Amino acid sequence: MIRRITCMLFTLLWVLNSQSQEFGTHWITHPNRNDSSEVLFRHTYTTLQRPLQAFITFASIGHCKVYINERNISREIFYENKTAQGILLHTFDVTRYLRPDSNTIAVWYAPCPQALAYTPTAINKQLSLEYYGTKPDSTAFYHQADDTWTCSILEGSRISTDSTGHAMEVFDNRSYDHSWKATEQPMKNGEKPMRSGMLKVEHTYTTLPAFPYKGNFLKNVLSPISIYSDSLGTHFEFERTFRGSVRITLRGAKKGERLEINGLLYICSGEMDEQAFRRLTTSRQKTITIKGDRYFDKSQIQKVEGLEIY
């Protein structure tokens, strides 16, 4: 409890200081940015000793996942800026994930079509991040994401909108590098990000402690109650409507095989077992439809799970 109170007080003081320095005026973005590509960011900070305590504060106009030493910094599935009136700051104590020699921060960013609609410059606000805390000798340290980081466009994966205006994810599992968060592995097609400054930031909100953030947490895993097929595909119906995504476990799918699943276009890697699910978006649904190309056979579907996220 004492540690938690200390964390909150430290965070409050730091956020107030960050706002006084106009947190969010310094952003990084991929040099070949566009309004649909997903981007991976990564940087390793070397140390002589394990920091005594450390925090990460970050902001993004898009959707993102944040890791340190390959560990998700919280239980949230992903983060998103849910307000058109300001920029949300997310702050987390990452002390328990720290290593004594080096610490790698990795961020998976995806654009938000809605944000691009109400904020034309959102394409330049991919990531603003601060990593700070206390060294073993009780002195402070501070780092900010800048052009010393490495970034890479996630090939074959993007977020766009469908014909109805809803978000649609495209995920190509053939080109996804599962080791992209790791320190030891060079980032595929890595480049240095560009700095993208803002002269002024209005309405900056923090998630702690004054502005509680209703995040994207996994609440329940649901099972379908009925299955049927017709000319439109294979349908799985759940007992009730839920907000979230679905996770499809596949076996024996061919490399390059394409599946359409309620807002997701998934391209198979050809591994013996693989899972198709939306990683950075959600929607409300009660029935899902799986439609495949000529290589698809419904016997490839081993399991269907409804992931209720709110």
How would you describe each model-predicted region?
Residues 1-22:
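Bacterial Sec-dependent N-terminal signal peptides
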Residues 21-310:
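Extracellular/oxidizing-compartment recognition motifs
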